[in-house]
Amino acid sequence: ADLLIVGGGFTGLWAAIEAKEHNPNLDVVLVEGNAVARGAWGQNGGFVSASLTHGFSNGLDRWPNDIAKLTQLGQQNLNEMEQFVIDRKIDCDWMRVGEMDVATEEYQVTELQEFVEVAKPYGEELVWLDQAETRRRLNSPTYLGALFDPDSVAICDPARLAWGLRDVALSLGVRIYEHSKVVDLDERGDRVTAKTEFGSVTAPKVLLATNAFPPLLRRLKYLIVPVYDSVLVTEPLSEQQRRDIGWAGNEGVGDTGNQFHYYRPTADGRILWGGYDATYHFRSGFGVQHEHSTKSWPKLATHFFSTFPQLEGLRFEYGWSGAIDTCTRFSAFWGTAMDDKVVYVAGYTGLGVGASRFGAQVSIDKLLDRDTDRRKLEMVNTLPIPFPPEPFKSAGINFTRWSLDKADRNQGKRNIWLRTLDRFGMGFDS
């Protein structure tokens, strides 16, 4: 092959498409250890954000000199994604409906109102909704107001989006091999061989797009950790239940605590409700057994009915957990290995459905040595601070989670541990 891509999630699929559209004569091979969209890309909440930096505030704090450009590139990325879905007729329930970030505590009202003015000079067109308008759109007694972003978020069925991208990649001539787990990379001369359980693929250029899965490069073990986020999906709402809550605009919704929930309506009339608990398992524990853990479900269900008491008695029909590749800066990073023959990208930290396309484009820029503005960004040319080894990693993550929970119960006031992490540009999120 001319280009080998390891990983059949959004990053890998977008990269394959990007490479073939750049040069149709490239022989592009994509290998996936399970099935396309089997990982986080098929299990996530289905929010497609324009943000490339896990939210505007995170980007402003870390890359103030580039945030205007990053905001513009993120909006362009979302617009191009939407046009791609339309042009390629990908049936994935795509809706450009925006997002409401709701305040459920008084201190959050002040923070969100101030944020409108902070973000405005950088092209963020945000609208403050008072309590009455917020509850007119979506009726919860917990809402005190909301920040509405009308244009920077879409919602979709992520698995069907990934399957659509797979079909496009195949139509362009990409060779896709599923159930072909890569177990080792071997550098020989000017080529790299990826060994699977059933054979091998050799190429001069390799992209590692495995994200939360156990990494093939040792260095990535210290840059990302897998955390598990849980989702519940209700049975379809009756017409009366839908009238009771409203939601005519179908907006995506998130609350604004440190430990937050995200939720959206589905095309078949259900509510997808997820978030809050981001669970880390000792020694970066990873596997199917964690996807079926029901530990967080009762807590999520309690929070759901606290938000929508008028839906008491509604049943949850589905639930699952999926792994997120979190890093200390909460957003994607890139690097190279084996004399630049291998490029890796990871660290989306739970906001990667949209950002993965950008991540793929930057990766192809690097692999094909394309001179683009994207490659000059500080974000693209820096790495996150590594996590410490065990047992310090587990202790630090769990103490951070405890501190975030304490802050949520104390008007958002961050203790000395969280303030220290903030000072050094570190943290834990999903």
Report the location of each language-model feature.
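Glycine-rich FAD pyrophosphate-binding loop
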Residues: 20-43
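Dinucleotide-binding Rossmann-like beta1-alpha1 core, especially the glycine-rich loop
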Residues: 51-133
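General small-molecule cofactor/ligand-binding pocket signal
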Residues: 127-130, 175-177, 315-319, 343
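Active-site substrate-recognition segment that forms the wall
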Residues: 46, 87-95, 182-184, 190, ...
